[in-house]
Amino acid sequence: MNSINPDEFIEVTDESLSDFIKTHEKCVLLCWKEKCPYCRQFFPIVSSVSHELSNITFAHMNIDKNKKAAKNFNVRTVPTIIVFYQRSVKKGIIGMKSKFAIKNDIRLAFATTFF
């Protein structure tokens, strides 16, 4: 998928996902498929959110190539965003959403970890 800027998103795989989650206290994983037209539209939106939430590490994973991780996190629909905090899943965001909605959902996922 040509719209991915490697400087903005870390690519993770079945093998590297666990280390990624362990290494980054606050992280967001965007799950996608190459043939998904919505995923192509979604990347620029998530990229913009990643710039505004610069204290969070963003990564992407092609679930066609990484079926084990997709199964482990029950990813059946793309695009899907998984929000992690301290190695735990805090929220799943499924389907296309606006930039405002994504940013708000991510912020709320982290806000609930402190109550």
What are these regions (language model features)?
Residues 1-27, 105-115:
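N-terminal leader/targeting and pre-domain segments
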Residues 3, 30, 41-43, 65-68, ...:
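Mobile acidic interaction elements
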Residues 11-12, 31, 47-50, 54-68:
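Thiol-based oxidoreductase modules, predominantly thioredoxin-like and allied folds used
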Residues 16-49:
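Local sequence-structure signature of Cys/Sec-based thiol-disulfide redox active-site neighborhoods
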Residues 18, 67-70:
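Short hydrophobic/charged patches on amphipathic alpha-helices used for structural packing
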Residues 73-84:
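Structural micro-motif
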Residues 82-115:
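Non-catalytic, surface beta->alpha helical segment in thiol-disulfide oxidoreductase systems
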